[in-house]
Amino acid sequence: MNGKYPQKRAGNPAYFGLKLSGNYRLPSLPQAYMATGHNSAFISSDDKRYIVYHTRFENRGETHEPRAHQYLINEEGWPCMLPYATGGETASKSGYDKSSIVGEYYVVNQGNKIDKSIAEPEKWVFTEDGFVFGQGMDGTWEAKDGTYYVHIKTALPSEDGTVDAADSYSGVFCKMKDEAGTDVMTFSAVGNNESIWGVKYNGK
């Protein structure tokens, strides 16, 4: 399974592929998930796509447990792994009302490094007029009418006060249950050779 692989960042071959999941912490998880590996992917009889893997946990040594996450395909054909273990969710192919999307999200960026660092959640706010802002970041978001597709552009201010070129992410929305059983709106998107996940809580 050694490369070369096409990159999400550009079309040039590389010796690594798009990182879907790493070490991360999300609301409803009692501990950070770590070393999410030994992956298998399959398509079920009802045409849903899944990734099955084992995960270790922060401060629990070699203890590990299996998990299965559904993944969806974005508008450009790239896989987007949903943030939480599957609970039988079915994404609405016709999309979601804007009122169920706008609000405050906890967002993790899986990055592209392979090390022991944990991706910690940051708060992003999606506004009704198509803007997104968070910790030292602002940008735009757009849901494609009649689909669950979303396109997000973010930019970080540089040290000289200017704004760096925006990063673009293409992904999907899906309403699902977190691992505490709470119904939440989520998104998963990929771009810049990175995967980002967002989870909205309490109608904020």
Per-region residue spans from a language model:
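Carbohydrate-active catalytic/glycan-binding domains of CAZyme proteins
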Residues: 1-204
